[in-house]
Swiss-Prot record:
Disruption phenotype: When this gene is missing the DISARM system does not confer Nf, phi3T or SPO1 resistance in B.subtilis. Keywords: Antiviral defense, Cytoplasm, Restriction system. GO terms for cellular component: cytoplasm. This is DISARM protein DrmE. One of its GO terms (biological process) is defense response to virus. The keyword Cytoplasm applies. Its main location: cytoplasm. Signal peptide: none annotated. It is found in: Cytoplasm. Coiled coil: none annotated. It comes from Bacillus paralicheniformis (strain ATCC 9945a / NCIMB 11709 / CD-2). Component of antiviral defense system DISARM (defense island system associated with restriction-modification), composed of DrmE, DrmA, DrmB, DrmC and DrmMII. DISARM is probably a multi-gene restriction module, this subunit has an unknown function. Expression of DISARM in B.subtilis (strain BEST7003) confers resistance to phages Nf, phi29, phi105, phi3T, SPO1, SPR and SPP1. Protection is over 10(7)-fold against phi3T, 10(4)-10(5)-fold against Nf, phi29, phi105 and SPR, 100-fold against SPO1 and 10-fold against SPP1.
Amino acid sequence: MLYSTSDKSLVHCSVPQQIFYRAEECMGDEIVGSLLCKENILLCTPRKYIFPHLVLRALNMDETMGFQKRENPSKRAEILVVTNRLEMLAFLETCRVNAERLFQICSNIHQYIGYCNMGDTYFARVYWRHILYHYYEGKLPQDVPLHYIYPVASGYRKFNALSRGNRNILGRKDSQNPTIYVTENLDMLNEQEHSFDYIFVDCSYIKKGLSNLPKSTLLFFDNLLDDRIPYLQKSAVKNYIVDGDCIQNIDENEIQQPMINIEELLHKVSIHSLDVEYVKSSFEQEIERLIHLLDKLRKGKFSRYDTNVAAKLVYILIRLPIGAGLYDLIASMQPYWDTVLGLLQELKDSESRYENDSFEEMVSLFEDILYKHSLDRSNPKGDELKAFILNEVKQGKSVCVVSNSRKNQLALKEFISLAMGMTIEELAEYDLQFFVSKDIWAQDITVHCDSLVMYSAINFRDLQSLLKISYKRAKLYLYSSEINLITQKLKTILEAENYALRHFVQNSTQQDSTNFYRYLYNRFNKFARQKVIGLNSAAADLLEKSTTVSPAVYRGEKDYKGTDAVKATLVHFTDGSVSFFTKNSAVYVLDNKNKRVTHKHFHEIGLKDTILFVDNDARKDLYRIFIQSVDAKDTSKQAYLSIKKWRELYEEKFMEKRMDDDRLFRLMRTAGWNKTTKSVLRNWRTGYSYGPRDREDIMVLGEVLGINTFVEDVQTYYNAMSKIRVERRKASRILNKLIYSSKQVLGNEDSAILARYNLTLEQLNESLVTKSIKEIVSDRMYYIKPAEVGLLYNVDAKE
């Protein structure tokens, strides 16, 4: 076993452990051996509790032999662990060091390095028998807490070590650096001032991109369809990928042991009954030419704003499940959503349009796709989706449709409801469910259906629902460009050796024919084998690059000419950055006199003011940072998700009734609503506010729009909104202390709040930036998109 309570290795856990298979034990030994040899490891397995145990195993092996490989063998190993800080610290608190084994290791190290001055605290690692004898007053225990011997430190950029023994007596006897550093900051991998001997990154928790891996780094994944896995094949990593093929070959005698659910494990690493359908479109060549031109323009340093608009348009057209006309009707009802025609018009209105033949050709290709090939009126994917869904519903089957975005989900709901001649609300009566893929994972939703339907995939993330949803049959509708891209990603992984297989699977034929990625590859690659489509790795790379959209690119001095344009004022800050604000934009402003952050409208602020941005967005509420960091099962997260559900129901009915804020305001007033500001209706719908403050407002809105649950479950929604407002006030209190406390020290209550949200002050600091106003441009008004209000731009990012 790996560190069970009966294990007499150096470090073990003092609480009952999950049972590890023999194959996992052997694999773990090989992985740690590779780390000692300065190799990088990619480990993917659904058994998440292996990750912290590998940290212990690396420490154990380093103390027995690894120290001999270091330039300074007297130095103790330093291990960086990038993961959920609180969970890892809780695990380490249960770990113990076997005293008998420790003393043996001290003797071995002492013998290897030679003379050590007993009075020099740097050499405490070889004198633990003496130190512990005095600490425990001659009554040496069998086991000692891990951090007494191997100091543990946690932090984000600055690390604080745990106290070692009563009043840190043991810590004062040992002057070497901590052994285990626990953080959630991935940037520590590239920390120049500190060199770690081993690095463990929990990629199941840390979702950022990975690059420039130091030697002896282990990357842990629990999802076979993580997009970083094919990307990392470009680096020198050894793959240990545990899929269903591995788990099915575990010794039957081991499976009978307690605490093991083999079926649950297999579900996490297996895909079955998948049909990939090639959707032939008449505009495939235009898409291929578009991504080539876009790449050419970007390499030629063409307008960054215009190429970003073009990338958005390519992305939307490939993802669309319906005609662009109906999509635009839905998107135009939300103030922050781009429409297809709106983006196209931006390109046509560009000041750079006639300066570059490639750009002009690109505009013509977009027009051809919409009008010559009729994507404005119909969609080849939508036609096949509709036929399949209606047929399944006719047979009485339950259907789950997964979309990549809320926009496409809403558009497809409207499309299918019109085809079935019913309201969106009534679709659920036919066991027809619609989900956004990221919600299934982020909210830990459990879904069962007969038929799972998806209609776009330009990355592995789009396929992840296949591992989460319990289905009998899955259909995936894709264009040739999408099939080519996914096939190339799968091919990249299959070309690399999987070192985990030899520990689980002895039959070499079986190793190649039934693994997870091979199963998927065969279903995607069949179209190339049948010569229906051609595979092209260069085209796959271009598609991936071309559909990468930057979140905020400065438009410069040019006005936006769309019908949804808003008038805004340009603000220059002292560091050269800029932002746009409307007259009534609500912003956070630093009140230095009273040492607090206040909420003001833009027309109330002046040149001496300092504006607060959260993640480079003046409109973003700080509480969003808190709620993003907490587990889906937390009561605050549940309340937040309840508000999200309420908002989506409101959004859907607003769209279905082709409503606008003026009309809804009149209907609300007629129904007895006593509010006089119609802007709150939009704020509720867009998520700018956390819903109504009055219980009656929820009921009136439900009665006017015909949403029964707003009336029946009003107390549930009201309680959720009230709870989040209380939590938001707590976040604001912490914000004030964070900005105005020079020592940035919180009291016990505020520290407990941060701990519950799994945050540190350093993490909050990374999300916050304050900007001092240098100039408010008063001689000109700018016309911009509603979504551009309040965003922070670097001027040099304009072109």
